A protein has these predicted regions:
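Two-component histidine phosphotransfer core
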Residues: 1-149, 159-161
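Short, surface-exposed beta-strand-loop junctions and turns on beta-sheet-rich folds
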Residues: 107, 168-169
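Short C-terminal beta-strand
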Residues: 160-168
């Protein structure tokens, strides 16, 4: 837990290795386990070779926080899964990294899904959408407009899925 705060307050880098970010979200999820007990669990999977790819710090946590906040009331157990894998997209010869944050909650409502996946920038509303808006803006600044892609979907089994596709650096 002190590691969690150290990462938050001492990290001034634009990009960090995936392994550092995964260690950070593990610390964050352990704090959430203390908070929610048996109604919360998590899984983290990273494909071999992705650990040294550099990504923006706190990027994954932003979407994990949203999953926890919007999943449900924790009357039913929730699982949050984070997957990181190599991905070749759109015929590009260079590789990308795909980050997925999935949960077993209630998923996105159709109007929220439509809004999140539209090309229209999100406007923060009453303290909501600030994390998502900041993440999108950071990705555009770091990688260039349209080079990093975020899509939002609902899983067939229920729950939400956020997929982030980044150039492998």
């Amino acid at each position: 837990t002190s590691n969690y705060f150290r990462y938050i307050f001492q990290n001034t880098q634009d990009l960090v290795p995936v392994k550092n970010e995964l260690e950070h979200i593990k610390n964050y999820m352990e704090i959430q386990k203390m908070r929610y007990g048996d109604t919360f669990s998590y899984e983290i999977h990273a494909e071999e070779g992705t650990e040294n790819i550099r990504i923006p710090p706190i990027l994954i946590q932003t979407f994990i926080e949203n999953a926890i906040k919007h999943s449900n009331t924790f009357d039913d157990p929730i699982i949050i899964r984070t997957d990181i894998a190599w991905m070749t997209a759109g015929g590009n010869s260079h590789e990308n990294i795909q980050i997925q944050v999935m949960d077993t909650g209630c998923g996105f409502s159709e109007d929220i899904l439509q809004s999140l996946n539209s090309a229209i920038p999100l406007e923060p509303q009453n303290g909501h959408r600030i994390g998502i808006t900041n993440a999108i803006q950071r990705l555009n600044l770091l990688y260039g407009q349209g080079e990093a892609v975020i899509t939002f979907s609902n899983l067939p089994s229920g729950g939400a899925c956020v997929t982030i596709l980044l150039p492998a650096i």
